Structures are given as C-alpha cells and as structure tokens.
Regions:
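Short, surface-exposed beta-strand-loop junctions and turns on beta-sheet-rich folds
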Residues: 26-28, 35-36, 126-127
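Unchanged
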Residues: 34-124, 151
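Detector for Asparagine
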Residues: 24-25, 39, 91, 137
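Generic cytosolic/nucleocytoplasmic N-terminal low-complexity/intrinsically disordered segments
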Residues: 16, 22, 30, 63, ...
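N-terminal strand-loop-strand
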Residues: 1-30, 41
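Charged phosphate-binding loop/patch that engages nucleotide di/tri-phosphates or the phosphate backbone
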Residues: 120-151
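Small/flexible residues
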Residues: 24-25, 83, 129
Length: 151
C-alpha cells in the first residue's frame, strides 16, 4: 500500500543571499502541502510567508525548478512525497524581521550568502543540497549573479 503527498516550496533569494529555515536540527527550505483548490505556485508563496514571516506581496516567483522526491515507510504504508520547487525573489527589506513558524517546528529563519552555503548544506538533507546545487549551476543563476555584480 502506498500514499502520495504533494508539497510545494521555494528557494528564496535576495541579492546574494538564500533564505533557509531550521527544522529538526537541519537547514531546510520553506515548503508545505498543497490544499484543495490551491495550486503549486500559490502554495509555495503561502508556505514561504507562513513559515518565515515574510509578506507574500514581497515574494515573486521567477522560475519553476526541478521537483524532489522523498520516500519513507510509516506504519507499513509507503509514502512518496513530491515537492515542486520555485525560485522566488524577495523584494522587501532585509530589515523585515524573520518569524519562524514554531507551530511547524521551525526554530530559526536566516539569510545566508552564497559563500556560506557549503557549511549550511552540510546540515541539510541530500535533496536540499541537490536542489541548491542545481540552482547554482543554472544559466539563469549565472546571469542573475552577473547582474548583481554590476551594482
């Protein structure tokens, strides 16, 4: 017997930083389950806002990324969790306080520079490392990085 769970989330970027959440003693990316009547893109924005305290009006989806899959067995039921990921730009201020959603077990939210990612990813799930490495190797990211260097 198996069960499927669909979730959606994002790599949130601003300037040369990525937003991570701390959950279960690991750095992770904000995400959550799709609810009836809400599509994957909307879910990503809602979950990022709920889990980090960032205002949804300051979040813009730039691009759909690759999905990740997670498999586990719970009480004899095989669960497959598919997460649709989006590249999301935050156009608000870094001064806006990050508010971890403690009801979801999130203990911290923090912006990390691209240079700090090696250490952050050591404390992340393999699927998160894979996704972030995919993003960093995208032609889109390389153009984005070059654009930022001109400021």
């Amino acid at each position: 017997m198996s069960s499927k769970i669909k979730t959606s989330g994002g790599i949130v970027i601003k300037e040369h930083k990525i937003l991570f959440i701390r959950k279960n003693n690991r750095w992770d990316l904000p995400k959550g389950k799709l609810e009836k009547g809400i599509n994957s893109r909307e879910t990503a924005i809602i979950e990022i806002s709920e889990e980090t305290g960032l205002k949804a009006k300051h979040l813009s989806i730039l691009k759909k990324l690759i999905p990740t899959y997670y498999h586990k067995k719970v009480d004899g039921v095989f669960i497959v969790k598919k997460t649709d990921w989006y590249l999301v730009e935050y156009n608000g201020s870094f001064d806006h306080p990050l508010v971890p959603d403690q009801s979801e077990g999130i203990t911290d939210c923090r912006w990390f520079s691209f240079d700090e990612l090696v250490l952050v990813l050591e404390e992340s799930h393999e699927r998160i490392r894979y996704l972030v490495e995919f993003f960093l190797n995208m032609p889109f990211y390389k153009k984005y990085k070059l654009k930022l260097k001109t400021y």
